[in-house]
């Protein structure tokens, strides 16, 4: 089976789910006892992130491709997928031309965050996306995002111009800027112990 490039994985029971990102539109279900793909789910073009919330719902956001792409161009979307049934429960459309990415969860698994120019946040139980962002765009190149599992602080990576040292901004869960510091070039991922 051709998978293209894969991006992220989450586990539910004996299954691992992985999103196929580059020029793909699938999430694969892999049985960890046999290491075989046992199912696949079609979503929008280029699912960029994959997380599992407190209700055992998976979330992915699709990039939608780009104008002129041989693979296609469509509205990006945020998907809520039931891990037990491996079915799409809810689809939240994003505007054509937007570039959403970096779906993350807080430590409790009940608040979802993502980048779409601004930083957005919503409850995993919400039935619609918010109308106002959690953090407004600051004339930056938001490139990475994470939420501290211990205290809920939100860390945003800024690639600046993709040539110089990047910047990390740390906000409280209420959106108050508490720290900023330089890091290496093009910061794009975080890891928690």
Where are the regions that the model predicts?
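Repeated scaffold domains used in trafficking and secretory/extracellular systems
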Residues: 4-11, 45-53, 97-107, 139-147, ...
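Residue position within the beta-strands of beta-propeller blades
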Residues: 18, 59-62, 113-115, 156
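A short beta-strand motif characteristic of beta-propeller blades
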Residues: 1, 35-41, 87-95, 128-138, ...
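Structural recognition of the beta-propeller blade-terminating site
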Residues: 31, 82, 123-125, 169-172
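Short glycine/acidic-enriched loop and turn motifs that connect beta-strands
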Residues: 22-25, 64-69, 118-120, 160-164
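Blade-level signature of beta-propeller repeat domains, shared across WD40, Kelch, NHL, RCC1
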Residues: 167-193
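A short loop-to-beta-strand structural motif that recurs across blades of beta-propeller domains
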Residues: 26-29, 76-79, 118-120, 167-169
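Short coil/turn segments that connect the beta-strands within blades of beta-propeller domains
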Residues: 13-14, 55-57, 108-110, 150-152
